[in-house]
């Protein structure tokens, strides 16, 4: 682990039905329609990686990116990621069928395979980094809601900082991320379809998110990126970044000590 001072955003919930933040008409957010980033590089990662390598690439991008960057990616096999503060004992029962990985970010349990997974890196040199973590979280999800509203039904953001009063689906853990909407999560027809978690260091901020029910083949990824910035360009990842990712995958994310840290 780095010696840098690091914080991981983890929003816990209680039993209360959330109200909604209107993604199109919220008087408290006059800049809701203004793109978050002046410039944004996009990395459409077409390779299917192991869970450890996916986490490693995200961290390597945080360490090397010179500007705001969004990465969209696949999973080599069905996977389950859980937050930095999560307990391995809560997910161990899924080890036989899924590739388990502890994220560097906070949050709950997320099942991967049929989702559109993304990460956003914001270097400390970018003005957006100076905003609060929850403000960044909300603005990113507003952009996602805008992208979804162009091709899907009514999409809103959960306003309450507490989770919905609902009974978890049978067979799913109570700390399943998508069973517990929190403030600024993306909702469609009363159901959470997108959530995320963050890690902030002196180098920048990393947000890792999952959009359930949307495959990489859809045009949602491009619409999402364009809602975040009107000046997008494709990222060419350097061999140096890949080498750093391979090191992190082997020495950190792929190790038993990291997986069973708690």
Question: Residue ranges of each PLM-predicted region?
Answer:
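Residues forming anionic-ligand binding surfaces in small-molecule and nucleic-acid pockets
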Residues: 108, 112-127, 207
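Long, positively charged amphipathic alpha-helical accessory segments at protein N-termini or as interdomain linkers
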Residues: 140-172, 176, 199-262
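Compact, glycine/acidic-enriched structural inserts
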Residues: 128, 135, 151-153
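Active-site loop/lid in soluble adenylation, ligation, and acyl-transfer enzymes
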Residues: 33-95, 99-103, 109, 230-262
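Intrinsic disorder/low-complexity segments
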Residues: 1-38, 154, 164-173, 230
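Short terminal or interdomain "cap/linker" segment that borders an active site or interface and mediates
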Residues: 43, 47, 171-203, 208
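Ser/Thr-rich, low-complexity intrinsically disordered terminal regions
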Residues: 80, 86, 165, 181-182, ...
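Short, conserved charged micro-motifs
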Residues: 90-92, 127-131, 216-222
């Amino acid at each position: 682990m780095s010696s840098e001072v690091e914080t991981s955003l983890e929003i816990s919930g209680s039993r209360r039905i959330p109200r909604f933040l209107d993604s199109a008409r919220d008087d408290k957010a006059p800049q809701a329609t203004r793109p978050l980033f002046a410039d944004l590089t996009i990395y459409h990662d077409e390779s299917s990686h192991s869970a450890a390598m996916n986490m490693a690439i995200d961290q390597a991008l945080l360490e090397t990116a010179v500007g705001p960057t969004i990465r969209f990616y696949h999973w080599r096999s069905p996977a389950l990621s859980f937050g930095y503060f999560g307990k391995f004992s809560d997910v161990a029962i899924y080890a036989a069928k899924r590739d388990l990985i502890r994220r560097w970010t906070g949050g709950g349990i997320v099942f991967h395979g049929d989702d559109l997974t993304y990460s956003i890196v914001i270097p400390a040199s970018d003005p957006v980094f100076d905003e609060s973590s929850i403000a960044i979280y909300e603005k990113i999800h507003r952009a996602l809601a805008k992208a979804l509203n162009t091709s899907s039904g009514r999409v809103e953001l959960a306003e309450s900082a507490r989770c919905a009063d609902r009974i978890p689906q049978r067979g799913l853990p109570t700390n399943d991320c998508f069973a517990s909407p929190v403030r600024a999560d993306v909702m469609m027809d009363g159901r959470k379809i997108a959530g995320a978690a963050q890690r902030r260091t002196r180098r920048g901020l990393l947000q890792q998110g999952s959009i359930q029910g949307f495959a990489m083949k859809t045009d949602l990824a491009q619409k999402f990126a364009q809602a975040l910035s009107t000046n997008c360009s494709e990222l060419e990842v350097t061999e140096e970044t890949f080498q750093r990712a391979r090191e992190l995958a082997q020495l950190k994310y792929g190790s038993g000590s990291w997986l069973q840290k708690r």
